[in-house]
């Protein structure tokens, strides 16, 4: 009976996700067709996981999508999406290469952006090298450069593009792991990851204050516990871990809705993908 209940909940969740996606597509297409304007989004780390699903859903909504990846030639799923959607452009980008970021911003200087989406990052998978007394300090700079400084630099370089857009959103995928309010949920072996997300949150709060005068809303997002590679699902089933996993389609659809509906008065807020405001 318990297994049946879980299946029923999953079916209902998938159904509600599809309804949300269809409504988002309808609204976006109606707005675009009203006066011929096509909204645009710039997405980092679009080759897999959350970034790929963001790309898939925005492209399905008829947006112009500029999707970046460190190795586009090896991003088969992203290339397949581009073949289906003529409005999807793929660009090579390493978010730690500031000269490359500036060059890409210059290349698209005439392209207004409705949403600048900082998604690229090093994941929070536990590692013995992030355990106190066993720390590999050489990893710290990597986490900080990719997860914190990269989004900051991209937000600064593409600020003129966002100012020229209609929706005016800077959205950044963060994590509840970077929240001091969630310190009781600490996962061992994620020290550098959590520190980088805490730094990211504070940087984006400062960005929010700096760009509010341009009517730009800054949004931080917690995607939930999404199993992008299937590993957590397998562990959850085999070890009965009781993890509350989130479907990637539901997480992304929810975050897209949060980005679209966030208000300037709440700029700098971190949201659960469901729209719930979270504490820092």
Where are these regions (language model features)?
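Conserved glycine-rich cofactor-binding loop
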Residues: 47
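Conserved glycine-rich Rossmann-like NAD(P)H-binding loop of the short-chain dehydrogenase/reductase
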Residues: 61-76
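Short beta-loop-alpha junction of Rossmann-like oxidoreductase domains
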Residues: 74, 126, 181-183, 221-236
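Rossmann-fold cofactor-recognition segment
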Residues: 82-99
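Conserved Rossmann-fold cofactor-binding substructure of NAD(P)-dependent oxidoreductases
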Residues: 96-111
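Catalytic loop of short-chain dehydrogenase/reductase
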Residues: 122-124, 129-144, 163-213, 225
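C-terminal helical subdomain
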Residues: 213, 220, 233-280
């Amino acid at each position: 009976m318990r297994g049946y209940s879980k299946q029923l909940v999953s079916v209902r969740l998938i159904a509600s996700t599809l309804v949300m996606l269809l409504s988002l597509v309808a609204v976006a297409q109606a707005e675009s067709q009203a006066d011929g304007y096509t909204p645009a989004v710039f997405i980092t780390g679009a080759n897999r996981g959350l970034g790929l699903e963001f790309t898939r859903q925005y492209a399905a909504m008829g947006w112009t999508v500029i999707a970046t990846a460190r190795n586009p030639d090896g991003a088969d799923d992203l290339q397949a999406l581009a073949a289906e959607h003529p409005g999807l452009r793929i660009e090579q980008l390493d978010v730690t290469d500031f000269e490359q970021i500036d060059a890409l911003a210059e290349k698209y200087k005439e392209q207004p952006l409705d949403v600048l989406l900082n998604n690229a990052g090093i994941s929070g998978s536990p590692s013995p090298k992030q355990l106190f007394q066993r720390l590999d300090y050489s990893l710290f700079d990597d986490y900080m450069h990719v997860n914190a400084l990269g989004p900051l630099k991209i937000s600064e370089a593409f600020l003129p593009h966002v100012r020229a857009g209609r929706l005016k959103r800077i959205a950044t995928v963060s994590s509840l792991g970077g929240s001091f309010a969630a310190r009781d949920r600490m996962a061992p072996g994620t020290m550098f990851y959590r520190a980088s997300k805490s730094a990211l949150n504070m940087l984006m709060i400062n960005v929010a204050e700096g760009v509010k005068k341009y009517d730009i809303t800054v949004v931080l997002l917690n995607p939930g516990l999404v199993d992008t590679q299937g590993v957590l699902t397998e562990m959850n089933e085999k070890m009965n871990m009781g993890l509350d996993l989130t479907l990637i389609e539901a997480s992304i659809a929810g975050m897209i809705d949060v980005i679209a509906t966030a208000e300037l008065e709440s700029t700098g807020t971190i949201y659960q993908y469901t729209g719930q405001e979270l504490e820092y």
